[in-house]
């Protein structure tokens, strides 16, 4: 019989990351930089999203050796990505002892119809979402943490802003609905009714909701916090910048003090060049990672 963690325990682990920054790293050296800069966790992977996007082909779970090297290098929680629907990659990461698994659209999906039943696992999961319907379905499957999908590896914040604003607007809409309207709304957005009822009563998702996908500067991180994010994932924005150590520290500080504009101005001075960005409209439909895991049965 497979051991499974309770929602309360899994969600509690995610709550502990609230207000912080989670950084993508590809080796132990980068993990140490992230930890020293104040990251609350790191995401261990073979290539940051910008490199995955540039390389093309099939992107898979990282080599377990990389994951273990990162785990041995830092004392903060370590996350790792598996492909959408790939049961065995998820089980391997769980066996390695990672603190969190990201069932991620950044990697090439293994299943175009089904996401993982995350309730079958002891390890908690984070999943991406573009709107309340997607978030609710992932939570219904057992996700303990949600993040905006944004458009990974672009250094362009516009899609993360779109997704966060969409979710916040839909949460406000549900909160103001009468109970007898909820079933129709659940049908319309493909969300579990009981979850919408919980959102109506509390005015928020039952799990933390981080921003991800396109965060490249301290100002980007502060913007997402102001829009209602509980924290920030930074993928390519740190180690594709000119000065990773400076960007890492500045983004952590800006995430914490997201309404202190004098401080954010100071943090933004002399950082060097941010990662090269990509205009979203130049991407073909096949290059848009945010649409993965959605078109067929998300």
From Swiss-Prot:
It catalyses: aldehydo-D-ribose 5-phosphate + D-glyceraldehyde 3-phosphate + L-glutamine = pyridoxal 5'-phosphate + L-glutamate + phosphate + 3 H2O + H(+). Belongs to the PdxS/SNZ family. Pfam families: SOR_SNZ. The active site is at 81 (schiff-base intermediate with d-ribose 5-phosphate). D-ribose 5-phosphate binds at residues 24, 153, 214, 235-236. It is an enzyme of class 4 (lyase). Keywords: Lyase, Pyridoxal phosphate, Schiff base. Catalyzes the formation of pyridoxal 5'-phosphate from ribose 5-phosphate (RBP), glyceraldehyde 3-phosphate (G3P) and ammonia. The ammonia is provided by the PdxT subunit. Can also use ribulose 5-phosphate and dihydroxyacetone phosphate as substrates, resulting from enzyme-catalyzed isomerization of RBP and G3P, respectively. Pathway: Cofactor biosynthesis; pyridoxal 5'-phosphate biosynthesis. Gene3D superfamilies: Aldolase class I (3.20.20.70). In the presence of PdxT, forms a dodecamer of heterodimers. GO terms for molecular function: pyridoxal 5'-phosphate synthase (glutamine hydrolysing) activity. Its EC number is 4.3.3.6. D-glyceraldehyde 3-phosphate binds at residue 165. It comes from Halalkalibacterium halodurans (strain ATCC BAA-125 / DSM 18197 / FERM 7344 / JCM 9153 / C-125) (Bacillus halodurans). One of its GO terms (biological process) is pyridoxal phosphate biosynthetic process. This is Pyridoxal 5'-phosphate synthase subunit PdxS.
């Amino acid at each position: 019989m497979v051991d499974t963690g309770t929602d309360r325990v899994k969600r509690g682990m995610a709550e502990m990351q609230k207000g912080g920054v989670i950084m993508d790293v590809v080796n132990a050296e980068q993990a140490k930089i992230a930890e020293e800069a104040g990251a609350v966790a790191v995401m261990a992977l073979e290539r940051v999203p910008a490199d995955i996007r540039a390389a093309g082909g099939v992107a898979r779970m990282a080599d377990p050796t990389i994951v273990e090297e990162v785990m041995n290098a830092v004392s903060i929680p370590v996350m790792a990505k598996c492909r959408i629907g790939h049961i065995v990659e998820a089980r391997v990461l769980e066996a390695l002892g990672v603190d969190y698994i990201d069932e991620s659209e950044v990697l090439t999906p293994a299943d175009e119809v089904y996401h993982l039943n995350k309730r079958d696992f002891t390890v908690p999961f984070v999943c991406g979402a573009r709107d309340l319907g997607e978030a609710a379905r992932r939570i219904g499957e057992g996700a303990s943490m949600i993040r905006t999908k944004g458009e990974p590896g672009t250094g362009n914040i516009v899609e993360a802003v779109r997704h966060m604003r969409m979710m916040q607007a839909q949460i406000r809409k549900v909160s103001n609905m009468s109970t007898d309207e909820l079933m129709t709304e659940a049908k319309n957005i493909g969300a579990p009714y009981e979850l919408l009822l919980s959102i109506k009563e509390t005015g928020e998702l039952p799990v933390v909701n981080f921003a991800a996908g396109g965060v490249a500067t301290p100002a980007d991180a502060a913007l997402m916090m102001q829009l209602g994010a509980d924290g920030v994932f930074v993928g390519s924005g740190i180690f594709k910048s000119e000065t990773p150590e400076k960007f890492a520290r500045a983004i952590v500080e800006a995430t914490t003090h997201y309404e202190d504009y004098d401080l954010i101005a100071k943090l933004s001075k002399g950082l060097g060049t941010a990662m090269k960005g990509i205009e979203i409209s130049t991407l073909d439909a096949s290059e848009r990672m945010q649409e993965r895991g959605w078109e067929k049965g998300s």
